[in-house]
Amino acid sequence: MAAANAPIIMKEVLTLPSVGIGQQFITFTNVTMESDKYICVRETAPQNSVVIIDMNMPMQPLRRPITADSALMNPNSRILALKAQVPGTTQDHLQIFNIEAKAKLKSHQMPEQVAFWKWITPKMLGLVTQTSVYHWSIEGDSEPVKMFDRTANLANNQIINYKCSPNEKWLVLIGIAPGSPERPQLVKGNMQLFSVDQQRSQALEAHAASFAQFKVPGNENPSILISFASKSFNAGQITSKLHVIELGAQPGKPSFTKKQADLFFPPDFADDFPVAMQVSHKFNLIYVITKLGLLFVYDLETASAIYRNRISPDPIFLTSEASSVGGFYAINRRGQVLLATVNEATIIPFISGQLNNLELAVNLAKRGNLPGAENLVVQRFQELFAQTKYKEAAELAAESPQGILRTPDTVAKFQSVPVQAGQTPPLLQYFGTLLTRGKLNSYESLELSRLVVNQNKKNLLENWLAEDKLECSEELGDLVKTVDNDLALKIYIKARATPKVVAAFAERREFDKILIYSKQVGYTPDYMFLLQTILRTDPQGAVNFALMMSQMEGGCPVDYNTITDLFLQRNLIREATAFLLDVLKPNLPEHAFLQTKVLEINLVTFPNVADAILANGMFSHYDRPRVAQLCEKAGLYIQSLKHYSELPDIKRVIVNTHAIEPQALVEFFGTLSSEWAMECMKDLLLVNLRGNLQIIVQACKEYCEQLGVDACIKLFEQFKSYEGLYFFLGSYLSMSEDPEIHFKYIEAAAKTGQIKEVERVTRESNFYDAEKTKNFLMEAKLPDARPLINVCDRFGFVPDLTHYLYTNNMLRYIEGYVQKVNPGNAPLVVGQLLDDECPEDFIKGLILSVRSLLPVEPLVAECEKRNRLRLLTQFLEHLVSEGSQDVHVHNALGKIIIDSNNNPEHFLTTNPYYDSKVVGKYCEKRDPTLAVVAYRRGQCDEELINVTNKNSLFKLQARYVVERMDGDLWEKVLTEENEYRRQLIDQVVSTALPESKSPEQVSAAVKAFMTADLPHELIELLEKIVLQNSAFSGNFNLQNLLILTAIKADPSRVMDYINRLDNFDGPAVGEVAVDAQLYEEAFAIFKKFNLNVQAVNVLLDNVRSIERAVEFAFRVEEDAVWSQVAKAQLREGLVSDAIESFIRADDTTQFLEVIRASEDTNVYDDLVRYLLMVRQKVKEPKVDSELIYAYAKIERLGEIEEFILMPNVANLQHVGDRLYDEALYEAAKIIYAFISNWAKLAVTLVKLQQFQGAVDAARKANSAKTWKEVCFACVDAEEFRLAQICGLNIIIQVDDLEEVSEYYQNRGCFNELISLMESGLGLERAHMGIFTELGVLYARYRYEKLMEHIKLFSTRLNIPKLIRACDEQQHWQELTYLYIQYDEFDNAATTVMNHSPEAWEHMQFKDIVAKVANVELYYKAVHFYLQEHPDIINDLLNVLALRLDHTRVVDIMRKAGHLRLIKPYMVAVQSNNVSAVNEALNEIYAEEEDYDRLRESIDLHDSFDQIGLAQKIEKHELVEMRRVAAYIYKKAGRWKQSIALSKKDNMYKDCMETASQSGDHDLAEQLLVYFIEQGKKECFATCLFVCYDLIRPDVALELAWINNMIDFAFPYLLQFIREYSGKVDELIKDKLEAQKEVKAKEQEEKDVMSQQNMYAQLLPLALPAPPMPGMGGGGYGPPPQMGGMPGMSGMPPMPPYGMPPMGGY
């Protein structure tokens, strides 16, 4: 059966590799397909990612970098579910993402691993763990809900599917497990069926299952079915079954009968098993898909087998339902995505014909609405009708596929049945059946509605229409209109009977719906007529209708201006305005005229409306000058100002401030330029300064930045309006920092009497010019002095203020200023009053009135400056008596006491409140000792030092410095820059320190001397303290300091100090002495304190006398001392002495250095003694290893053997390697043998020339490197037998083979190498390299064995390598064979042709050349055969026939002159109709005079130079050849040449046939004349019939009559008359039919017109509007011009549109 006729169509939708999916990822665990929408692939290389393939756009996959163990796309939407194992646990983390929203919907961490999961519904995931099954909804925040536990039969099964029934009441889980031991290849299938309602499970054997819904006849509710397929092995028999069972049968309802069927597997598929099952809900078919690609198709209702075929050569591992087409998708291992669908054109014929199952064919055709069962259905219908089974017939007609019985004939059949009394009419039964099944067609709907309307059951119609059971049509609407207009309108709308719908809406006056409906259906009604109709009754409705028209897509169907005219013709100004305002909202330039119009009509009739329009700023393209004039006339001055663009116009209008809103006028100023604005302001001030001042001030405030503040100020100043200036600057002041502005504001406020404002600004402003303001206020002499006080107080003009007030006798303001305003400035006031010679009583009273608020310091300064300090005595004493602790009070009082010499020392020592610096400074010139007292009391270091230096009071200075104990002070007085340093040091050493009893003071002084780097002075100081029996003689720190200072400053005294002092830090001082290179002193210190190690180190490291150190060590006999000596000896290279010393010291710590030194000096005997001593205390691998090495160096091999047998920690491997490296092979041999290091032992034995032992050791080592070393050594020693033993163990390693081969070859051992390789062929681990290398060796050294070797082992050779070897050695036959084996046919062919004596063999070459890829080699092969083997060239050409360019081959042979040689080849390829081949063969046939073959060639192959061939053979001596030439001319359309050539040879039949085929009347008639001239009457008669269509009857009759051949022309005439009369009859018949059609059409048009006239009253005629004033009549013509009429001159033209006349301009 051809694939085109198969009932199932298979199509490859795509291949996964074609969209970039790697073959390794096309597996069950990596690929998922949950529906026919998406395929999801999980990749793990080159990086973890998930690929989502949308089946609508498969070549645009979405790849996202995601790491997961599994990924599932939602069946319906772009939602992705991901599963990944939590690292280090057996838990799985689940996540659900919305890819489009890029948001995570839900996540959950499962406590156990999910073995399988699947989308069971678009909102639900099924999760299968090792023990249980869970459901997880993607909606809400719910966690997975456990549904049931897995049954035992699914333990250790691989879960392959999980599904739920459509009502989610039944669940099925499917798994597979290894087959039984008797049949392990057949995989077991297990199924668990679970009922959600009953909470019970049932275990069954099945490989695949699926749920379905099926309506059982007699049951309106669908039944839930499960179908499952199984294949099991029991008792040696394989059973394959398909089961279909109903789940949860409905009580009291018909149930589905259980069905089962066999699955027939072919013998080659005995171990195949079902892996998937899909149920087509569209056709109710079951698809069973097996692993090896078999497809079984069964009917769901009957379980009848329909089809079986193999749909995939590769195993199928995944399927998914393709619900839209009633098929399924399948994915196989190769990555093909296959789509299986029902072949709707062939499946019914297949079932009825091939399967002979007529009932199934009919049922499936009805169920799936499929073609192919028409005859069966019609026949069955007729049978039922004949049997009066009307109900069954009605059901069959209702279910008939593709509605073949849903015709008027069927309705007529039921109508024709007579109705029995008391029974339902069959027609109603038929319609009832149709209504239960679905929707009626238009004819059925009309017929049923007639019945219902006649019975007045309108409600039935409404119900059916609501349920969409009827197909609406215009005829149905016309029928229903007779009973219900509303219902008819609904039907018209559904039937898209647009004219009827528009008429109905117009009848209902629902004009807005007309527009909506017309837009929806694309209908264009008469909008003008509709608008006029609405205007008559509903002006506002007309506005709404016009606006709806304006919003239509594609623009308003009626011009806006026309619509406006319609409104204005009826004086509907408000409606016209409303319409225009709405449609002109876009404010487009093309609407300028309409914008002007709407403004004009409203400015004349409703100015307030026009004002609102203009205020909203809706329009910007109207005639602004025209509107400006109209606004001015209407009194809308602000609008006219906005529209005028000339300054005179603006100035004329703007003075009407009485009618202009002030705020609007202010805003208008903002639209003018600064120059025009100033001009207008001047006019306003000129007209009415007082009345317009507020507006001007407001405008200046608002636009001061644009106008310029200076310009505004000048404007007010020009009109001397200080009031305006005051109000203007008052608002601007807070924003300005201009001093001039602030000053002018102060000036304006002062001149307008705003004293409080002057006071406020002078107090708060920071920007006015203080000097200028002060002068202005002094000149103004305001009655209130507070503004002046503010200025002078803030800007430091207090003396000027005081002088002004004192001279103007404003003493009250002086007191007020000092007491209330700023008491802090009282000193300045007092100073100025003193300067103004004010009475002291007033001043004292002023001071006392302020008292504690008065700042004392500046007051004292002011009085002290003027030598009037005593003036303050009473004031100061008064403050002290009040308990004042103010330093300035006490300073002033002290100065007065010092000046009066009233016991100043008592005051200086007892008063705690004065400032020592101030008072001390005051005393310096009066009494320096008093200054020292004051400075000492205040610790004024710098001042005290300065005054004592200046007055040579060094003893006081020394005592003060010692007592202060201040480091900074000491540093200052001991610095070199101090010229009095020596005098101070002398006083400190002689007086201050000896007097001191404080250790802290001494310590501070010593530290200061050290810091100042005065060592000699410090020694002098310390000797005075330490050596002269003072209180500090035994002080530990001072003794250390004395010695250390001496070390630094005077080393000659150090030894004396060491001998005289005992209480110092010996170790520390000794180290310092060493650092100072006082080695003997250091040695003496260390000896004195018994620090022997430090002492010997001084001798060794500093004095560098090993002899003294050895002598010292013998004297003290301490191990530590000997250890130091040994180390020094070791450093100096006295290794033996050092070893002796280390032994005396019993010191093992330096064994590494001793070993190193011993090896350097080769003193291994001493080293052995030392290491034996060390071993007793230390267990170190290094020690034992070095001991063995030392034994080896002194050749004590016996001790080595004894030592390694004893317990030790030596690193024997390392020792052995070291001995081997230093060629101590015998010792190394002992070590390697002991530690069983056979590899090293082998190479050691090689060094010792012990080859047999080396081979034995190498065998034990079994290391490639060892084998190589031993092998190469044996080869060098010509021990080839042993070398071969080694070599066989080497060449099995691919990497080492070439090295062995080169080693043998470099030494000329070719035969031995070949013998080794030949032996290697038989090895179990023999690899390609051995076979290849042996082939290379044969090619080089034993050519005769090469071919045999290649043929025997061609599959085990590295052919490219051997190809190179054969090419180098020029073995062409073998090279060709190798090229063939390697599929390099181009190179093989080239080699054969280039080296044909050795390499060519015909059969082999044919096989080669048929497979070459380079096209040029074909033609090279043709040349090669032409030159060397021409006898068999056709054999070669036939092999290459499908690949050759035949034209090129012919050219090659033609140039070579051997064209005939390839005639058989050309005959074979002539079917390709190649011009060169055709011409070559025709040429050969012509030369051979083979006219039959030539004619056959011309007929069958037309690609050649026809005229050239004809010209070549038209003069041939053979007639048949000339006939061929004529035949060629005929085929080429050269009719005359062909006929002339045939005439020449008397070939009259050919002439007639040529003339007939030419279609040329003249040519045929000329031939008739020729036959008449030749007297060929029979030819004349024959020619009339042959050329019947070309010869005109009058010409034939004329020629026959003239030439007396009427008898011969008569047959022709009879035939012509018969044909002519038949044509006339046909024409008459056609004309009669056309007349009938015209009459029928006219009658139909009349019927349509009468039908339309029924609704004429609904659409009144468009009557003209009544005449309006100024218009001649109705219609749409322009109004006549009135200006030129008699008696009307001087009148302005009347306004159009019925508007009242406008005023003149």
From Swiss-Prot:
Region annotated WD40-like repeat 5 sits at: 206-270
Region entry Proximal segment, spans: 653-1705
Cite the residue spans of the region called WD40-like repeat 1: 25-67
Q: How does it sit in the membrane?
A: Peripheral membrane protein
Which region ranges are annotated with the description Heavy chain arm? 537-1705
Where is the segment annotated Flexible linker?
Answer: 493-536
* Annotated region described as WD40-like repeat 4, given as residue ranges: 156-205
| Involved in binding clathrin light chain: region residues | 1227-1536
Q: Where is this region: WD40-like repeat 2?
A: 68-113
In this chain the CHCR repeats are located at: 551-697, 700-842, 847-986, 993-1138, 1142-1283, 1288-1434, 1437-1580
Tell me, how does this one assemble?
Clathrin triskelions, composed of 3 heavy chains and 3 light chains, are the basic subunits of the clathrin coat. Interacts with SCYL2B.
UniProt free text on domains? The C-terminal third of the heavy chains forms the hub of the triskelion. This region contains the trimerization domain and the light-chain binding domain involved in the assembly of the clathrin lattice.
The text of the family note is:
Belongs to the clathrin heavy chain family.
The entry's protein name is Clathrin heavy chain 1
* Source species of the chain: Arabidopsis thaliana (Mouse-ear cress)
